[in-house]
């Protein structure tokens, strides 16, 4: 295109714009003279370098082809398809514009105040010759169609062509992938597809376009058309440029003023900012100070609360509210940690708090030690309190009745498992305190130690009280020394010193038994309570804290060890007392050792089998005592029978009771043997089983031993008493059965020998002080041997029934010895009467047979026989039945021998018949003899009858 002059020219026949119509004439003239088309293309603000632009006259005129106007309604189907996308785009565009305006609000405000014409602001930066005067409105984002404000019926100018349908536009322009860079689309749009592609060519040949002159010419024409349209557009906007330039100059001036003013404002603003910074720093400092003051107030308030709670903790410790104190200490620590986090202040590092924590440690240790001590004292106190619910006598009666040693009693043992609510609450609180202070193990260990000490003190206290019973009249120094002395030290001192130094020798059996009763039954009650306490503790630990439940194993051996402590104490006491045990009567020994056995059995029931030497020691002591008792009893009986006067004594009811028990024991154990009697006073020399010879209404002449009635002497009563003691001992201590059998046989063997020697031997007169041995002596000896035999058989059957042992050969041999000795006594009676009949019959040779009265010899024989009958009938009816017939037969034999020759003399026969008739009459009348008169019948028969006989 040819370059032409750049002189301004606006005579193109275009109508003037709205802006140029309102400009002042002066401004239009100056603008016309100064502005040119070239200046329109320069930067109106900063024209750094000139830009060459062609003028209108330099452009070759081109006839513009009219651009058809398509009505909006033709675009409605298309717009309807893109309505949603366009609505979203419009919404985003408006939001973006709004943000931009808000961001540059000051700039828009300054522009509104400037002298720029408002019409410039309403004019779009892009316009076409086809754009109508009114602006198109944005579509509503909520509507489905897009509408415009222009009227479809606006008459176009005369330079525009008639409306045509959009359907005449090729469809390629409406494709979604429309892009002129695509060669195929470009070929279709340029309508030269036939040039670039032949029918037999699959791909277009782009080189054909470069050589096609028609296409080149058409493209050139298109470019000219575009250029003209651009020039037209520029021409339409050229009227506003002078005003814009003027406004720009004014704007530049105002801008410089504004810049200066802004500079001053910036300086002031800087000063203000500096002052603001200073004020902000001051405010920050004040705020920091206020914040710190607030924090300080909170810290002080927290510390005040902490110290107030600490004071309450101290009061709780002082008042022994240990659980509240521990919870208070833990609460203080929790509050300190919580407040440290909330206030962002390490309160635990404060010196006052550190000092407070040290005090808490001291209080914590104090609470721990106090709770440990209180826990032990509380349980031991409950143990002692429970053991004193019943006194020692009531406990003794209950335990003896439980073991069937005395009749049943109405009272029963208190339940050891009954705990009141206060006790359970106190134990629960103590365990909580011990768990929180980690001192549960120490508390349980101390509890065990306290229990052991309590049992030691219990035995020691009763021991001291028992000694002081006998020492109450002694000096106070002695009583204090006894109270301070321990059992072990007393035991050692008693071994080194004489027996008189043993304080037990001065104690009566009643006092000693009472002391043992207190120790035994109080200890059993304490152990019963301890077992219940252990169950309660284990239950509480299992429910409360499973982690520390294993500590309950500490209490496993408490019962067994406690029983060992008690048994050691009482073993020491019994060892000390055993030095004088030989003087005890059997009833007292039975009472004491029954207490020992009851105590041991109850211990095994409560604590299981113990390993202590208590029961072996007790049984060894009992066996030693029994051996001494057996020896003493045998010697006493032997001495008694040796000094026996052999006089029948009246039988008192107590003696008959003794005989009944000895006789009945073979079938059933007498109740009196199984019952336990209270200990008696040691007055054996005066009152213990001393029987005076006295006759009362309750006394009988004989003692009934089953179906037999026997006369007894004083020594026989001693024998029955001894057998009664043996029966009691065996009823209570079946372990003594072997020693019992041996001792009893030795005793009967000794007595049998002693009686046999004294009654039948030659030393009777000298040993017993008798002037001569009479028939009653022999009769009572026979009765005594019968008593021996009956007692031996009954006691042996009792032993066999109780122990399950069979009778030994020694027992049978001893029984046979008694039978032999009894027969010897019968022979002794016959022998004595034989001597008597010999003396009497020596007078027969010198007698005169012509008198009518009995002779003196037959009268003497009758008197002797009657006297023997009376003695035997009174003292030994059994011997009377057996001996009198033998004596009569012996008399008949001797008289037959002496009188046979005399009876054959008829002159003497009447005298013989008178003597024999007198003899038989006296036997029948005085002795109750109902037998045949054999001798008289023989002498009355004829010689022939006698020869035949």
UniProtKB/Swiss-Prot annotation:
Pfam families: Vps54
InterPro entries assigned: Vps54, Vps54_C
Keyword Protein biosynthesis listed: no
Annotated coiled-coil segments of the chain: 243-312
Positions carrying Phosphoserine: 483
Claim: tRNA-binding is one of the keywords in the record: no
Its membrane topology: Peripheral membrane protein
Job description of the protein: Involved in retrograde transport from early and late endosomes to late Golgi by linking the vesicle through the t-SNARE TGL1 to the Golgi, leading to the membrane fusion between late Golgi and endosomal vesicles. Also seems to be involved in protein transport from Golgi to the plasma membrane and is required for the integrity of the actin cytoskeleton.
Name of the protein in its database record: Vacuolar protein sorting-associated protein 54
UniProt organism field: Schizosaccharomyces pombe (strain 972 / ATCC 24843) (Fission yeast)
